[in-house]
Regions:
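Non-catalytic substrate-recognition and accessory regions of acyl/acetyltransferase enzymes
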Residues: 1-103, 111-131, 135-175
Length: 175
């Protein structure tokens, strides 16, 4: 079972060796933790579920992190903008990918995302939906989120102007 810590500037040395992998989107997630997540953790209000968390295993090793904020999407009604909790970034260090062995519900990645879902439910004023974007060629992540009942949100995908990568919009309705 993972423990979590709200990310603060003093935790920056803990994340310097964080490594999600070699794919461009994996490097992007690791770099986000080392730069923008720290900035966001200090500048975003902690109200309404905003924040960044570090997740540690029983050996106190940094396993992963997650950042949640709010976003405005024209969904489900394309004529109306609505604010939703948004998983800005979720990362698991490559050393802990697929760990621990056993059922997927016990894996670190699963624990992190279900913890984010629980965070969202603490703030009913922002709704009971969690949104995110996933790289279009990251089939493993897409399957993972589909197993957690995330669905594709048509018309909200975006193309990163710097990398020309396409990211698919996904959302899950929480109980």
């Amino acid at each position: 079972v993972l423990s979590k810590l709200r990310f603060r500037w003093e935790h920056l040395p803990l994340v310097q060796d964080f490594d999600c992998g070699d794919e461009p989107w994996e490097r992007e997630i690791a770099n986000y933790l080392k730069s923008e997540a720290a900035d966001g953790a200090l500048t975003q209000s902690e109200e309404r579920g905003n924040g960044a968390w570090l997740y540690f295993n029983e050996d106190r090793a940094l396993v992963g992190y997650a950042v949640i904020g709010l976003t405005n999407w024209r969904w489900p009604d394309p004529k109306t903008k609505k604010q939703y909790p948004h998983a800005v970034a979720i990362g698991v260090d490559r050393r802990f990918s697929g760990q621990p062995p056993g059922p997927r519900e016990g894996r670190y990645s699963w624990q992190i995302v279900t913890d984010l879902m629980a965070e969202v439910l603490k703030y009913p004023d922002v709704g009971s939906v969690l949104t995110l974007f996933v790289h279009e060629s990251n089939a493993r992540a897409i399957a993972f989120y589909r197993n957690l009942q995330f669905e594709f949100v048509p018309g909200l995908n975006y193309v990163d102007r710097t990398t020309a990568s396409t990211y698919l919009a996904m959302a899950v309705k929480l109980p």
